[in-house]
Design a protein with these regions (language model features):
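Mature, well-folded catalytic/scaffold domains that follow N-terminal targeting or propeptide regions
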Residues: 2-504
Length: 504
């Protein structure tokens, strides 16, 4: 099993300001160690900490975890327990979103922690810990206290049959068969083999507005940090359960939320063998960006195939995809449009890590075809709209300069997002280094975040800034302003609680 870059980066930063020493939880009594036979059992090394998260009241959890950290509890242990507590106690039903964001946000919080200055590294994780308790309570209210059950061991297929059993179950949308099949596959196959298969199915449909592929990407990335061998089975059981949520929309070739995925599988076979050797073409990117304003999902896939077969670089296609997602947010900031960006981020990660050439082609077509679905869904919402275009937004020079200009932009952002976006363009024109802006954006999220999307969105767009060609990057960062946090208003009380808990 190869280690992804996320894992290598994580291993280089586990100290986290001197608080990440490899510590162990105190011994537990026999009564405390008794496990519910109706609930999935986790790795023995992490089970006590997960139970601590599950059983500690919300108003005491941050202080309890901080106390354990001071005694040697490691960042890696906290991250693992947080993810596992989520998948064991929060059901990805009726859709993969809402309360389930307690799971979806964990890797985003982790990425934010890696990018944070030492003194703020724990803020995203403590925010996610508190959010888990909120989701746990919602799960009790909405789903009757659902908890992940143990796998049905008698039905787990043998190693030689596990892969095909999972494929068959996913094709048939058979939840029970998929549950035992993924357990069998995880136990006997390597991480890359399992992930490669999941990339073929996680983004196949538009149900849950992209959360299925978001979960798949975040699960793979988090497992690279917390340990695949120890923790993959319960996490991937949750993932496959989420992937098969149909939201009362019967799967079928004629259902619009399924049709584009099936058509793109055939279209992917038409892409020339040398498709990755294409040349950068800014004009093609601009033309494709314009097309995304009107094209259907099926037309988007066909247009991308045409461009690739005309020797246009895949990067030029990605530029248009990122640009169109950014424009959607600019035009109508809201939950739907922000997910066009977080979904694109997740599909791009799958594309970067997939080993099968045909899967990579299909993922690129899917990234394009998701956008018209987002555009259509956004049109049904009542979010405030703006008549803006990604490629024609005019820069505005901030009145201040240097760090004071950054402060001006984020103060503006709280009142007038359009002016703030234009000032981002003006600032970057005079100061090509984006780090003062991106660092400030992260700080505001740490201090002002009130929703999982604040972390999911910011971690995605600040990462994808580097995935956009230089000529388009500044505009992409400017577009992201429409869902970033401004500096106005007080910090959340969680910031105070976290800092107080970690003192000493």
């Amino acid at each position: 099993m190869s280690l992804p870059s996320d894992r290598r980066q994580f291993l280089a930063t586990t100290a986290l300001g001197g608080l990440g020493l490899l510590g162990k939880l105190p011994a537990v009594s026999a009564d405390e160690a008794t496990l519910d036979t109706k609930v999935v059992h986790l790795d023995p090394g992490i089970e006590p900490l997960v139970r601590l998260l599950e059983e500690t009241p919300r108003d005491r959890l941050l202080e309890e975890i901080a106390g354990r950290i001071k005694k040697g509890l490691s960042y890696r242990e906290v991250l693992a327990a947080l993810f596992l507590a989520g998948v064991r106690n929060v059901e990805p039903r009726p859709s993969v979103g809402f309360k389930f964001h307690a799971v979806l946000v964990v890797n985003s919080a982790h990425l934010a922690s890696l990018a944070a200055p030492d003194q703020e590294r724990w803020l995203p994780i403590f925010w996610a810990l508190d959010n888990f308790k909120s989701a746990q309570a919602a799960n009790v209210k909405e789903r009757g206290g659902w908890r992940m059950p143990p796998v049905k061991e008698a039905a787990v297929p043998p190693a030689r049959k596990a892969r095909q059993a999972l494929v068959d179950a996913l094709e048939k949308w058979d939840t029970e068969a998929a549950d035992v099949a993924v357990a069998g596959l995880v136990r006997t196959a390597g991480a890359d083999e399992v992930t490669e298969l999941l990339w073929k199915y996680a983004p196949r449909d538009f149900r849950s507005i992209g959360h299925k592929i978001i979960f798949a990407a975040n699960a793979r990335r988090a497992l690279g940090a917390i340990g695949w061998q120890e923790h993959a089975e319960p996490i991937l059981r949750s993932l496959v359960y989420a992937m098969l949520a149909n939201e009362n929309k019967a799967p079928g070739p004629d259902n619009p939320v399924d049709r584009f995925g099936r058509l793109n599988r055939e279209l992917a076979k038409e892409v020339r063998a040398e498709w990755q050797d294409g040349k950068p073409d800014s004009a093609a990117s601009t033309d494709l960006l314009a097309g995304f304003r009107e094209m259907s999902a099926e037309e988007a896939g066909k247009r991308v195939v045409e461009l690739l077969n005309k020797s246009v670089s895949p990067q030029s296609v990605w530029d248009a995809i990122f640009g169109a997602a950014g424009e959607m947010l600019m035009r109508k900031p809201g939950i739907v449009s922000l997910h066009s960006l977080t979904t694109t981020n997740a599909i791009r990660y799958a594309y970067q890590t997939a080993g099968d050439d045909e899967t990579r082609r299909w993922l690129l077509l899917q990234a394009a075809s998701f956008l018209p679905h987002f555009r259509g869904e956004s049109a049904t919402r009542k979010d405030k709209g703006y008549d803006l275009a990604f490629d024609t937004l005019e820069p505005m020079t901030p009145k201040a300069s240097g760090h004071e200009a950054v402060d001006e932009i984020f103060a503006n952002l709280s009142k007038d997002k359009l002016s703030a976006a234009r000032k981002v363009l003006g600032y970057l024109k005079a100061n090509p280094d984006p780090r003062p802006l991106t660092d400030a954006a992260r700080r505001q999220v740490f201090r002002k975040a009130t929703d999982s999307h604040d972390y999911k969105f910011s971690s995605a767009v600040l990462e994808d800034y580097a995935h956009v060609s230089p000529a388009w990057r500044d505009r992409f960062l400017a577009a992201s302003v429409f869902w970033l946090k401004g500096s106005g208003g007080a910090d959340t009380d969680l910031v105070r609680r976290t800092r107080e808990a970690l003192k000493g």
